[in-house]
Design a protein with these regions (language model features):
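ATP-binding N-terminal substructure of ATP-dependent carboxylate-amine bond-forming enzymes
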Residues: 1-80
């Protein structure tokens, strides 16, 4: 996998996910940022998708569809 142009999926829609998106958007390695569900701030940095953090099957389908190279889980709840 080439690092340049990496497709990133960030799961969550709060301030934490917005901050992660800001940081990742500054990286020359990141080509696109997708956030699900995202918020108004993340919309300005990439593409928001209407799939909640607890909708595991939908998130898996999305990650496959966008060919995500990296998935960042923002909220703790989906990890438990």
């Amino acid at each position: 996998m080439s690092v340049a142009g990496m497709r990133v999926l960030i799961v969550g829609g709060g301030g934490r996910e917005h901050a992660i998106a800001i940081g990742l958007s500054r990286s020359p390695s990141v080509g696109s940022i997708h956030t699900s569900p995202g918020n108004a701030g993340t919309r300005s940095l990439g593409v928001n998708h209407d799939i909640g953090p607890s909708e595991i099957d939908g998130l898996v389908e999305l990650a496959i569809e966008i060919q995500a190279d990296l998935v960042v889980i923002g909220p703790e709840a989906p990890l438990v």
